Amino acid sequence: MSRASGDAWVEGPDGARYWGRFGAAGLLAVSPRFEVLLQHRAAWSHFGGTWGMPGGARHEHESAVDAAVREAAEEAGVPATLLTVRFTSVLDLGYWSYTTVVADASEWFAPVISDPESIALRWVPVDRVDDLPLHPRFAEAWPVLRDRL
């Protein structure tokens, strides 16, 4: 692991662990069909078996938007050229942060599983997201994100 890589756990004062030495970011891509791209997380991953956004650890000096777009490209084949950032939402715990980047995709595309972190990738209609077993932190954030779409 290079010194610039953020791939490491951060432990909070209460013992809770968070992925990303420099924080983390995820991309919530929104299709022209009003669907969001979700990732079914591999069983071995943190909160495995749940659905959430492609995302991961930020690198040192990397912006949250750049990290979210990079992670989505790595994990789901999301083409950055099709994205227009709509807004960001930040959970800042003081010692660790997670930024959700919400971006419109100018056209529908087929996501591609390109690493072992995903069991499946799926465009999910916004009104059906709650039907899935969601990553607990995404489940907490989803109502506010949905209302802003």
Description of each model-found segment:
Residues 31, 89-115, 122-128, 143-145, ...:
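Active-site-adjacent beta-strand/loop module that shapes the phosphate/pyrophosphate-binding cleft
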Residues 79-89:
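A short coil-to-beta-strand element that immediately follows conserved catalytic motifs
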Residues 56, 70, 124-127, 132:
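Structural detector for helix-capping/boundary residues
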